[in-house]
A protein has these predicted regions:
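Bacterial Sec-dependent N-terminal signal peptides
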Residues: 1-21
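Aromatic (Trp/Tyr) and acidic
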Residues: 21-124, 128, 158-193, 228-245, ...
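Helix-capping and short linker residues that terminate individual alpha-solenoid repeat units
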Residues: 122, 138-142, 195, 211-215, ...
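Aromatic-lined substrate-binding rim segments of carbohydrate-active enzymes
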Residues: 125-141
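Short, charged, amphipathic alpha-helices and their helix-cap/turn boundaries
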Residues: 156-162, 197-212, 268
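Flexible glycine/proline-rich, aromatic-decorated loop/lid segments
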Residues: 264-266, 320-339
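C-terminal beta-rich recognition modules with glycine/proline-rich loops and embedded aromatic residues
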Residues: 309, 375-383, 388-486, 506-529, ...
Length: 683
């Protein structure tokens, strides 16, 4: 019997793998996170370590402290004791103890992040802890698969956002389908990381409940998600299981957008998705929807979806994209602004929105194979995403402004510095799941093409033509541009190695006219195999090496990494007369604490600045200490006295990577530095 069970399990896994291969959809395949091990004590190794040691334990502890787990326990109790006397008491009035109707997702997202971490740091205790959490999650699931504690705890008095009946206010506030999306994503990650289907079965039961009850057929609730993410999660579930019903439901949720009861720009429901050409509304919802459209387009071949997301992508990177890779100009509605509406001091740039852009840019690359999408993804990763989490993994930004006066309370909960948690904890828990997933963005494969998209110390085992290639990458990126790729094992023989040459090296900051380099620096790079220059070609931003590879072959890559200055399109009013400073993939900023003898808002950059790069140790609050490459430049401090007379004195400005600011408390910060008198202090 045991032998038969093992055989059936092997057959199931084989069929699942075949289904995944058959239905992936994208012309280019992402190398999964399970195949890439990030090297410890490297730039990204440190971040994954911080996620493991600090962020994820913190998130789990917050789930314990803030009633998240207890919500599942209470829902389970009600299921086991229908109509119990407690339901009539204030202690069981959901709105009095549950902050938001989507609080369940913090549990799911943290499990997802922990699952990714297990790939780099196997941990039996963590595995067992996750299993214990899944016990209480599963106990809260209703017999038909519905899992939404905001209602199940007390069906007669649910959370005030939940509505009286299932799906009744899904398009407004309930977040029932948003909860489903994060549950499915987490369950897929958990299955891929552990091989256990415990969470996957819970998620499938809820997805099956949704398929039964939400749709266009008679008797179904014809609604679409108020907050998108279920679309790409269901597509992921289809790819994992091969079950067509999940893809069909994902497509329904997209096809009926703009056709149901609610139609507004805020939730991108003002018109059908195929008619949308610009990025509008709540930036996180939008980004998740666009990523879901890409998934469904890849899996179904829907040309309408492809045309729409191509147009939306172009609108974002041409008119609504911050130099830091963030999106969402407005605090009101956490939303995209109008074309070229990119304020600095009051910019929103939610951390979750930056993460959603990584999802979109990755998918655009998998569809089209052009390095420009990875250029955008890299910019967002190194600036707009990691800025949202302190280097030690324990404090967070909800928004990410490009300037701060130390007074304007830009951060969530009306604060001006990084916080250990938020009442609405979507950003910390999202970082929990995203940072450890970074290995899955490193490489991609198409037929016999192996794409090297990102640069970070790692060892990867990659399938090419069904054969293993083990590739080791050694680098100090992003601090310098030297990368060594070593073939540690090759069963695939000849294949094409495609190495991305970043746009910041020899082209432009972004693939549009929104930003341009304003200096006359000529970027240069070299790529050699075993110390020898090789004949090659450039294709879509990739350096292509066609070769019969042997074990021990070393590809040496060098990207010059000079300091560059950037100007914005004149249509961006807030950046007129200003320049931004970059080095490699990192955007820099000036922070008051490094420049205490003058007001950085009144520092005037010279027309032809001369930069120096030096090592700097940042000694942050709460024993957070880390090293960066700082940039110094000579300029003028412009002062106006009581009589209105202007004077200028020479000063030396220090700049640090944007992600590193606010580790030493609140204060002045500026990304876009004035280069003309008219731009000084215009906040």
């Amino acid at each position: 019997m045991k032998r038969l069970t093992t055989l059936m399990l092997s057959l199931t896994l084989m069929l699942s793998a075949q289904a995944q291969q058959r239905t992936n959809g994208y012309p280019i395949s992402q190398v999964p996170f399970t195949a890439v091990k990030i090297t410890p004590n490297t730039f990204w190794g440190d971040r994954i370590y911080a996620a493991r040691e600090v962020t994820i334990p913190l998130a789990f502890s917050k789930c314990e402290e803030t009633h998240r787990y207890e919500n599942f326990n209470m829902a389970a109790y009600t299921l086991q004791h229908p109509g119990h006397e407690g339901l009539k008491t204030p202690q069981w009035d959901v709105s009095k103890f549950m902050g938001f109707s989507f609080d369940d997702t913090d549990v799911y997202k943290t499990i997802e992040g922990a699952s990714y971490v297990l790939q780099t740091y196997p941990d039996k205790k963590l595995t067992a802890y996750i299993d214990s959490v899944l016990d209480i999650v599963g106990a809260a699931q209703e017999p038909d698969g519905y899992l939404y504690t905001a209602r199940t705890i007390n069906p007669e008095h649910p959370h005030h956002w939940a509505g009286k009946k299932r799906w009744e206010v899904e398009e407004i506030l309930s977040h029932e389908l948003y909860n489903l999306g994060h549950m499915v994503d987490a369950a897929c990650a958990h299955y891929q990381a552990t091989g256990s289907d415990k969470f996957l079965n819970i998620a499938k039961r809820y997805a099956d409940c949704v398929i039964k009850e939400v749709g266009s057929k008679e008797g179904q609730a014809c609604v679409v998600p108020g907050h998108q993410i279920a679309e790409m999660a269901l597509a992921r579930l289809y790819v994992l299981t091969g079950e067509q019903k999940y893809l069909d439901e994902a497509k329904f949720l997209l096809d009926y957008r703009g056709k149901t009861g609610r139609r507004d720009i805020y939730s991108q429901s003002d018109k059908p998705v195929v008619d949308q050409k610009e990025a509008w509304g709540h930036a996180v919802r939008a980004g998740y929807m666009y990523a879901g459209m890409a998934d469904v387009a890849a899996l179904t071949g829907d040309e309408g979806y492809l045309k729409a997301i191509d147009a939306i992508y172009n609108n974002i990177v041409s008119k609504k994209y911050y130099i830091t890779g963030g999106v969402g100009a407005r605090h009101a509605g956490e939303a995209f602004g109008a074309d070229y509406e990119l304020p600095n001091l009051t910019s929103y740039n939610e951390t979750c929105a930056a993460i959603s852009m990584v999802y979109l840019f990755q998918r655009m690359f998998l569809l089209h194979g052009d390095s420009k999408y990875i250029d955008c993804m890299e910019r967002t990763l190194y600036n707009g995403v990691i800025s949202g989490m302190s280097v030690d993994g324990g404090r967070f930004f909800y928004p990410n402004p490009l300037a701060s006066d130390g007074k304007y309370a830009f951060n969530a909960d009306n604060t001006v510095e990084r916080q250990p948690w938020f009442g609405c904890a979507c950003c910390p828990s999202n970082l929990c799941r995203f940072i450890p997933s970074f290995p899955g963005y490193m490489y991609a494969v198409k037929d016999r093409d192996l794409y090297v998209n990102l640069f970070a110390g790692n060892t990867a085992t990659i399938k090419i033509g069904g054969k293993d290639v083990i590739l080791e990458q050694i680098t100090n990126y992003p601090w310098d541009g030297d990368i060594a790729l070593t073939i540690k094992k090759n069963q695939a023989k000849a294949f094409n190695l495609k190495i991305r040459v970043p746009g910041w090296v020899d082209r432009s900051p972004v693939p549009s006219d929104l930003y341009r380099f304003s200096d006359d620096v000529l970027g240069n790079y070299s790529i050699k195999v075993n110390g020898q220059v090789v004949k090659t070609e450039m294709a879509n931003g990739f350096f292509v090496i066609k070769r019969l590879w042997k074990k021990g072959d070393v590809v040496s890559i060098h990207f010059d990494m000079p300091v560059r200055t950037v100007k914005a399109n004149p249509a961006v009013v807030d950046d007129r007369g200003r320049i931004a400073v970059e080095r490699g993939p990192l955007v820099y900023c000036a922070e008051g604490i490094d420049n205490q003898d003058f007001n950085i808002f009144n520092f005037l950059m010279p027309r032809q600045p001369r930069f120096e790069v030096n090592d700097l140790q940042i000694n942050g609050n709460r024993q957070v200490t880390f090293n960066v490459k700082a940039i110094q430049v000579e300029g003028q401090f412009v002062n106006t006295d009581e009589k209105g007379e202007i004077s200028a004195t020479h000063r030396r400005l220090t700049m640090i990577p944007y992600y590193a600011w606010n580790h030493r408390g609140p204060g002045l910060m500026e990304v876009w530095m004035p280069q003309s008198i008219s731009a000084l202090g215009n906040y």
